Amino acid sequence: SEMRGFLEGMPAGMRESIAGYDEAQIVVVLALVYFLAPMYLILPLMVASVIAADSFAGEKERKTLEALLYTPTSDRDLLVAKMLSSMVPAVAIAWIGFLLYSVTANVAAWGTMGRVFFPNLMWVFLALWVAPAVAGLGLGITVLVSSRAETFQEAYQLGGVVVLPILLLVVGQATGVLYFSSWLVLALGLFFWIVDA
């Protein structure tokens, strides 16, 4: 069958993770655990980008940045505070989203799975290691774009390009070119942290 051909193309580690499941359970695990994993990364990326675009370009557009620059706060402290005000909510929302998705996935699939099956180790790495790195990537690119943008909308639209690598991960996972595993997720997180630095 088509499912058997798809499963044969998967890495051995991924095949082992679904061994012992019937076909309906395999579909649930593939859909909820593997195929949606890269899409989860869009959440911290976009939250950080929107908040950063408003914080940097939006302040410039509203002409409120000048007042901040006249305060006794150093430029460095102001930059760090603005970056943290984008990064912290993005990571918090990603972690809350992870918890809500964990509950929802287990409740929705209980009839098929009959047990708690989510999250697996790969998702824990994705939420705790990769999501903050992706938020940092969105933040960094938006800060760079905001320095040249005149308006919040312009900064947000130009910074939206940062979602393209994540969309490539989504397409790669859906087409079978790329399979998320714990090791790939750890490597992906390391790559994003290096880019952030």
Feature map (PLM): residue ranges:
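Long, hydrophobic alpha-helical segments
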Residues: A31-A53
